[in-house]
From Swiss-Prot:
Signal peptide span: none
Protein's name in the database: Protein MON2 homolog
InterPro entries: ARM-type_fold (IPR016024), DCB_dom (IPR032629), Mon2/Sec7/BIG1-like_HDS (IPR015403), Mon2/Sec7/BIG1-like_HUS (IPR032691), Mon2_C (IPR032817)
Biased composition (Low complexity): 187-200, 1204-1218
Family under the similarity heading: Belongs to the MON2 family.
Segments crossing the lipid bilayer: none
Biological role stated in the UniProt entry: May be required for traffic between late Golgi and early endosomes.
Origin organism lineage: Eukaryota, Metazoa, Ecdysozoa, Arthropoda, Hexapoda
Region called Disordered, residue ranges: 187-209, 1199-1219
Any one Gene Ontology BP term: protein transport
Originating gene: mon2
Keyword field: Protein transport, Transport
Amino acid sequence: MSFVGGGGGQDVHKFVEALQADFKTLSLETKKKYPQIKEACEEAISKLCTAGSSQQNSVYYTVNQILYPLVQGCETKDLKIIKFCLGMMQRLITQQVVDQKGALYITNALWTLMENNIEEVKVLQTVTLLLTTNTVVHGDTLAKALVLCFRLHYTKNPTIVNTAGATIRQLVSLVFERVYLEKDSVPSLQQQQQQPSSSSNGPVEADGATAGQDVQTFASDAFLLFQDLVQLVNAEQPYWLVGMTEMTRTFGLELLEAVLTNFSAVFHESNDFRLLLKERVCALVIKLFSPNVKHRQLPAPNNGTAPVPAEKPYFPISMRLLRLVSILIQKYHTILVTECEIFLSLIIKFLDPDKPAWQRALAVEVIHKLVTRSSLIAFFCKSYDLKNHATNIVHDMIAAMGSFVRYSLINASVMLNGQQNGGVLAQPTNALSTLSGNNQCGFSFRGAYLPLVATYAPGVSKAVYLEMLDKLDAPNIPDSYGISVGHAILLDMTRSIGGVIQRTPELHPTHNTAVITEEEHQPLCLQLVNSSWSGLLSAFIPLVETSMDEATTENILKAMQNYAALCGMLEQLQPRDAFIMAMCRASFPPHYAMSIFANATQSDGDVRCHTRSGSQDLSSQFINSCTPDDFRPQIVAVGTPLPSASLPHSVMQAPVMLTNKNLQCMRAILFLAHNNGGILGTSWHMVLQTLQHLVWILGLKPSTGGSLQAMPKPAVEANVGIQTAVMADLPVLSQMLSQLFESSQYLDDVALHHLIDALCKLSHEAMELAYANREPSLFAVAKLLETGLVNMPRINVLWRPLTNHLLEVCQHRHIRMREWGVEAITYLVKSALQFKHKTPLKENMELQTMLLSPLSELSTVLHADVRQRQLDCVLQILNTAGEILSFGWPAIIEIIGAVNEHHGEPLIRTAFQCLQLVITDFLTVMPWRCLPLCISTAAKFGSQTQELNISLTAIGLMWNISDFFNQNQDKLMSTQLQDVAILPEFPGTVKMPQFDKLWMCLYAKLGELCVDLRPAVRKSAGQTLFSTISAHGSLLNPPTWQALVWQVLFPLLDNVRALSSSASNEKVDASGNILIHHSRNTAQKQWAETQVLTLSGVCRVFNTKRELLQMLGDFERAWSLILEFIQNAALSKNGEVSLAALKSLQEIMYHNTTTERTVGGVGGASLKDPQTTQEQDEEIWTIAWNIWLSIGMESTKMSTTKAQPQPSSNGGSNGSQDSQEDFYIPSQAFLTALIQIFPAIFHHIQVKFSPTDFDKFCTVLTNAVCIPVQTDAVPYIMSTVSDTLLTPLHDGILDCMELIQKEATKPDSHISQLIPAIFRQLLIFSKFACAPPTFQQNVEHKYAKSTSGHYANNASVEVVGMNYIPFGEKSISICVKLYQTTATEESVVQEQILHDIVKAVRTPLAMKYKCLSSSTWKLAISSLISVLHTGLKVARAKPQHFASLWDDLADTLDKFLFPASVCTIEDRGLEEIVLDETIDCHVIELLRDEVLPHAHEMPHQFIMQIVVLLNKGSIHSASDTNICYESDWKLREIFAKTCFETLLQFSLLEDHHATNNNRINANLLPAGAAGAVGKDFAGRLAVTALLHRFQEVLKRFNDDERQSGKCPLPRFRLSEISFVLKAIATLVVSMKKAPASKVNKPAWDQLIGLYPYLVDCTTTTSPEVSRSLREALLQYTDLLQAPRLCGATTNDNSIQSNGQE
């Protein structure tokens, strides 16, 4: 065993020294009473001295000798000595120097202490250390140590009992963990054990030699310990744990459980352990279970003689036994097969009704733990159910759970009825009536309510009563707890069975998990289903019927779906059909379901035994015991029953009432069929029959394509209705139905035929009923159609059976049957012809014949309505499939030519559909000369006013035409039309190609539609026009572009502007139309949308083709014109229009300049020389700048030309309204866009950017900032805020300022003279952080009322405050950075920019804590410090320009350091105040470093102000008006100290760079050194002021202390006087060291005058004040000297100087 230091001999030496010191202490303690211990200690010390001088590990050899005095000490019964000895033992153990013999000594000593009840907790700690530090303790010593802990566990002290219990659990686990070491289960632990041996000598080798013994011993110890635990639990004497006097069975069971839970590998790998487990533990468990098995809880007999009770089970024992059994089954089932069978059978018996409720609750919790693991279920089935002579554990368990669930429901009902019949008031929690309004989870049967008191995640068990280890008595079990857990068990059982069948791997497999081979899997799965299906079904049926909430029902139904699917996968038809039948029956009221499925139930003989009989049907029992009113809250739909041959007349007359649960079951059936349609087989008929009935009851009717939709009920059906909530679910149900039949495309051919046969069977039944003049169900026909549509890829598989049945339907005499039969056939034929088959239909004549055959056969039907639909279908086929059918094209021409002007809307619609088909599909085969006609025809349909949708679709057709032109350009260009008269002329363009004329014809027609009276048409036409130009404009020749711009686009803009200005402002009548949004409810607003669309579209075209237009001439005129259009729109009072105009302007301004240069320099070289291009460029950008400036000045000007209206005057109403119309607040988005345009313009005009331009620009910026924010713009600001919290507008403004600043600071910049103006503008912005701009307007105009734009009807525009703080702070930061780079610029110096900055930051610094944000003043002071670091140097160099700075600077510093605003800890917190004081100290440090060393270079008055400021801050009293709390005094101490030290440094001590010349007496200096004299004078003044302040504080303290009597002064007063006394001591020291010029005689006199006040302070009772006073008085020593008898030749100053020595 090695010493654990690992640090070499030095650590050993330290340890030995510590031991020696401890032994010396022990020797002193025992010297008088216990001399023998003293002698043993001295001997131990000598041993240690010898050991310390030898090798590192030699302490190990002497440990047994030095343990002797410690063991003796433990026998003294002296608590002090015992504690000391135990502490030394623990240190020896911790250092791992105790061997086996020493461990025995220590254990014996601890045993003695235990027997004498001394220091039990210390004893337990020592035992724990001894066993956990290493492995030297084993065998009998280990047993004795464990017995010691057990004995302490059964003392009377609860603290010791709990500590001992925890220790025993830890040590038992430790004993078994050691087994893992010898099994090499944890190689890293072995590696750690070997590491010390490789680096040590001596004893480690000896320990290594015993490693083999240890390995054998560890397993032996664990075996003996476990064996004795079993003995003790069995109330027998232990073999190994000798000395045990008592052991509770509960504690023993807990220890057994812990071992079996955590160390299963030990038992699985060792035969001895396995044998012990099988023979001893299992026998013990079975024996202890005896009371539980025999006990029966029976009601008392009537004769009053109670039977002799058997031994009553004890809850703590039973609960721990079941926990143990649970572990044995889960972890040891593979080695305890027979025993687990017994255990499982016992647990199942515990569910019997005659067992106590708590016993049943414990049993279901154990079962829940087991069923969540699919591997266990598989093992149970394989080991028991599959064996011939074994118990069918899985079957019995599930059957018992089913019985348990049913009993729980029936028992709750019986108990409730018994209470009510017996006159006892039933508990309100069990009465259903009291819970009718609650949506609680649970089950209800015959008025008894069983809430779900426990919920579990899927596959997770959570025991409640199995965890009650601290309970001595059986708890009261809620009535509903059993069914709550039982419900979860059934769900998890289903899930586990699914995991076995689908071979889902477990998340946490163990070595104990049973392996199921492929050969075993199939029989196992079949047996699982056979063992489980009847029990599960018998439990699920009552659970579904009695569940109260959707979530519970959903879980149960999902389990039934999954189980039915599993049965289908295994081809177990009987269980599959039984589960599906149960779900189908649950979808209807019981009496209705019995009538529907009467035949189905009789036909399946084997299934009937597992379905419900009348007496067993819990739902029918529930119905018989409840009134109809009980169902009212649950009923969500009431409908008429579907006529059926099986329904008796009485059922037909009564309405069918569906509950929410019925609909939930319907959804479950849909999910089952959708996801598992391939395994339904013959069950399809049952599923579809159920869905048909539900669809009928809910009123879903077939619509186009076979889908179902909810139709409004006739008003006469008063007793039929559907709740609103269900009405919302009907589309979802319809969609689910459609998806079910869409999924049929994934079925194989056999499954698909099963589905078709089931649908045809249902349809035949409906036809039979229709012959009796009953309303037929069209469900089957509709779904046959839907099934055919989704199976088009294999239409030949189902076409003949499908269409043959539909032809029969078409011949039916009932008109609705006929109507839907022909609808299905025609729809299928049209769809089949349009479908893209693998072999093209045009080539597959056989398929084409088969598809057209049913349509031809319809000619044999005599009914006229069927023939009409047939002809319509033929016409549609000719029109839609003309390329496939050779005779299709002539029919299209005939139909189009058949339309005349007098035809009504239906034929116009049909004709237009034909036109759509022609343009969409047949333009390629149309003659060239028809293309202009097609354009004009489409435009005619676009301008017709009968049907808006036709107009919009016609515009879409014009886009299709343009696409055709583009795709066939080569063909169209090569074809020359001889008859040119059909093409229009476009004047001004010479020899325009015919292809271009075709395009211009299209563009002109679209341009006319862009000014249609209908907004939707205008919008669609505009989008189409610009999309067409964008997509296909490149096909035009360059000269044609000029015609397009001047003859189409600019006239369009002019027309839109004119029509917009003349549009009405009255609300549009929306009667008969859809609702119109408020932003489009007037013609003016609708024209605004058009204006936005056209302007942005034209600008986009102009921008895209700018290079091309520049080459064609008239570009400047076009540029000016389009900018005028933009300016006109930007100044519109409609926010949408103005913002769109700015976006268009932005798009034009940010046009790619490199492209311009390329076109101008290369492409345009032949047209214009570079000089002309440059002049033109300058001219167009000057126009752009003027337009921008005009927009900016006008839009941000917040007063109107019609101001001062008189609203109260008689004739002033019109003027008031006009002024309100002219007044308009631009939005933040508008202003942001405006500002963001400037950088693009500035890039081109910066050379000519004058100070006047800058002033105008700043006017726009300032106005924009001051404009208030409207409430509707707040989301815009919030959604675009950056991390710096700047709004986009503020961000853009500062970006512009930085852009100009960056340009102005470049070398040889043209605009460098703007730097001072930039500073002033930034400082204007910075002031907004403290004083945000306010929007002031006349009362009549306040927050603008506008009758146009977004704010119609004179509604007030509400505005909100904007956060200007980030904007102002960012401005300050930019200003500081700019000043640091331009401080030495002549213009900056002359314009006194530093003074301006000081004045700007004075406001936030003076406000300080009154600032809106603390960041403002903090930024202001850091900015001031930064600029002063830079600016003071400039000020000293050029003092003539800074004369006005100093007073403002001193005033600013004073107001900041001593603010009027109060700050307390409650306001800001202690840390914040400390940080604030640190900032104040930084300011003082600035004065110390940058001002005071250069005092002779600064104005005398300024230096005096600084001295006064430092003096004011050097003592706390200077700011006593702002101090509200005692702790604040201390917070200013650092600041006061900094001020005081700075003052001393300035007034008394020499500068470190001073020369000898500076120390000459001030009177001897020439006049030129007045600055230095002023400095000395200021220093003396500072000393005098300090001394005067000291005297005031001392005097006031003495007076207050005398008046206070025995009451001590507040702490802050004592702190203040202590600081003053320390300051006096420091001042005296400094005055002694100061040169004579610094200190004059009056100062010494004043200092000496303080002495009486100091003497008065000696009466204080404060130790802190006394210490400080002592330091001050000691400094007066040098001032005390004998009076001189002879005259001195020196002057007073020299005397003082001598006195300083």
